[in-house]
């Protein structure tokens, strides 16, 4: 599922509500029919995997960056990387999982850093994967390449994606269009294009290079 809308429409607020950084003034947020208010905050946040637009790669090797505090051994990690389709990336690196990385991933491209940051969260196997404008700082060419990897990683997973470039969420099962804190449209990319509403307008403007939100 993807959220789109102009700046200030409430996209990031929804993510903060889901993480219980804010509490809703009315209504409910349910995960598997359970009100998140009934889930201890620590448990809830362990259920969620959040990828933000600002990635952080620390100095160390690739394996350490991916495992963090998990108990995975390198063989398990290699198998997971293969399942996630990271083998092509690892083949590019001189020592694969043992390749040393500079702080903030200075020896990786922006797309490679983002792919590792997404994989790091996915490896935890969260109940819900949340991506908050995770490709915001990429040029369109890098983003298009990364998008193919993300579509494979996100398949068969529950994912909420906040998008600033509409081309990245065209394959989403459902797109929710927000404006001024309200839901104004919902549907697939094709359905929303046919409605000729706000989504259509934003899509047309963005294709012409006028809007990037």
Q: Which role fits each region the language model picked out?
A:
Residues 1-213:
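ABC-type nucleotide-binding domain
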